[in-house]
Amino acid sequence: MTPGIRAPFFLLLLLASLKGFLALPSEENSVTSSQDTSSSLASTTTPVHSSNSDPATRPPGDSTSSPVQSSTSSPATRAPEDSTSTAVLSGTSSPATTAPVNSASSPVAHGDTSSPATSLSKDSNSSPVVHSGTSSAATTAPVDSTSSPVVHGGTSSPATSPPGDSTSSPDHSSTSSPATRAPEDSTSTAVLSGTSSPATTAPVDSTSSPVAHDDTSSPATSLSEDSASSPVAHGGTSSPATSPLRDSTSSPVHSSASIQNIKTTSDLASTPDHNGTSVTTTSSALGSATSPDHSGTSTTTNSSESVLATTPVYSSMPFSTTKVTSGSAIIPDHNGSSVLPTSSVLGSATSLVYNTSAIATTPVSNGTQPSVPSQYPVSPTMATTSSHSTIASSSYYSTVPFSTFSSNSSPQLSVGVSFFFLSFYIQNHPFNSSLEDPSSNYYQELKRNISGLFLQIFNGDFLGISSIKFRSGSVVVESTVVFREGTFSASDVKSQLIQHKKEADDYNLTISEVKVNEMQFPPSAQSRPGVPGWGIALLVLVCILVALAIVYFLALAVCQCRRKSYGQLDIFPTQDTYHPMSEYPTYHTHGRYVPPGSTKRSPYEEVSAGNGSSSLSYTNPAVVTTSANL
């Protein structure tokens, strides 16, 4: 007998034996117990539950069991590896279904107030689990398994987390939140229609179908590496959180009133659909596409860190953040009163379609921006480098255009002006001390009338009047009038004032004794061609140095000339010039003059000590006589 045939019979026997002592009392609305249903080792398990409690049923390896239960308990079924398990639960409690490695598990359908937990292991195929109870079940599809979505028709909401290379399509129609996990290379499809919420988890390389919730809770969908996640649809007031990771595609559809967090990472696409009042937060990284659709009053913020455009919108009380990273496209669609701000960086395309109450758009750097509508708070957002933003908005917003610079420039004086000193008398106004105060009403009234008169007479050629002074003598007006250069001369101004005395009467001014003199101003200072100031200073310094050098050389030349014109007087000779004639000092009255450079002694200085044989010798007779007498 094949394992597929043995498994149902084994389950029937086991259920019949356990029916008597595992039955639990039924309750009308809720049952607080939950069992585990596990399918393992290439077996096919199809439990059918229609009772209030769930017994635990475990078929051995390579077996196929199809239990039908109509009592108040529900078993826990485990199908071994390479098995296909299909659990249908219609009691008030929730079994836990686990399909191990390389197994295919069918979904468990719950029509009671509890929700089962389904676990699909590696290379297993898991059919969707249908929940209609009030408990919460967890569906887990392990590595390389295929799990069908879990459908909830109660008040709970499932959380679907398929990891890498998995595709999860959670559909939520209950008020609690189940968690569905499909492991690596597995496909999990959990359908929950009870009041409980299963948890479905699809791990790495697995494909998980979405979990549909029609309740008020919020499921969480997590897609891991290389996984594809189908959208999660919410028909209640809760909001699911979808987090598909690397190389995954998530398309959550939301129609609840809570807060939904959608996070896609690394080449994934997430599409949330909101029909309630919830707030969606979408985060996708590395080439993901996020398309949230909003029909409620929630607020979604999309922020991408690279290669996308940024569009912030604020219109409601809740606030969420959508983050898309590295080459992702975000296309949110709003049909309610919610607001979705989207921020993108570095060259992505973001198309936002808003039917909400407030929109604020601020794209930067090569972006296409229409107007900036703002209502309530407006957040500035920056999109850099090749970003394109297209926004269609409607219903209740005010458009704020970009700031433009419009200035009322004063008359350009660079075209050339002419100044005239004007003096005249006003006969019909008395002079008093208030005309000496420029802030007085009398002063301002006369000044205003005079300016209006000149503007009427000279039209556009009159540029202004300044330095108005009033002095006594009725009222004597002394002022400086400015006209365009070359338009009027002093005589023309005087004649125009005299001819237009009737216009002066309209301003309650009776003018007489007009005197006009043209004011001559020196031409504008221009840089004259010549030596600059620093050049002149340098030239003066050089001249002083040259003069000092000339004086020095003149003094040196004079010294050289004086040295050549006079002889050399040896006052202190280096050699001894005194040579005594004899040993008696009385005969030596003075010295002898020795010319410079002469070393030869005078013949008179030589004394011979002999008998005078030398012709050059000199003998003193007195000395000789004296020595003879002795």
Swiss-Prot record:
Record PTM: Probably both N- and extensively O-glycosylated (in repeat region).
Residue ranges, annotated region (Required for interaction with GSK3B): 598-605
Residue positions, PTM Phosphoserine: 602
Residues in the Extracellular compartment per record: 21-535
Lipidation (S-palmitoyl cysteine): 559, 561
Record's compositionally biased regions (Low complexity): 30-46, 63-75, 152-180, 276-305
SMART domains membership: SEA
Sequence segments annotated as region (Interaction with P53): 567-603
UniProt KW Transport keyword: no
Membrane topology value: Single-pass type I membrane protein
Phosphothreonine modifications at: 599
Protein localization: Apical cell membrane
Position of sequence motif Interaction with SRC and ESR1: 604-607
Pfam family, one: SEA
Subunit comment: The alpha subunit forms a tight, non-covalent heterodimeric complex with the proteolytically-released beta-subunit. Binds directly the SH2 domain of GRB2, and forms a MUC1/GRB2/SOS1 complex involved in RAS signaling. The cytoplasmic tail (MUC1CT) interacts with several proteins such as SRC, CTNNB1 and ERBs. Interaction with the SH2 domain of CSK decreases interaction with GSK3B. Interacts with CTNNB1/beta-catenin and JUP/gamma-catenin and promotes cell adhesion. Interaction with JUP/gamma-catenin is induced by heregulin. Binds PRKCD, ERBB2, ERBB3 and ERBB4.
Record's protein name: Mucin-1
Annotated source species: Mus musculus (Mouse)
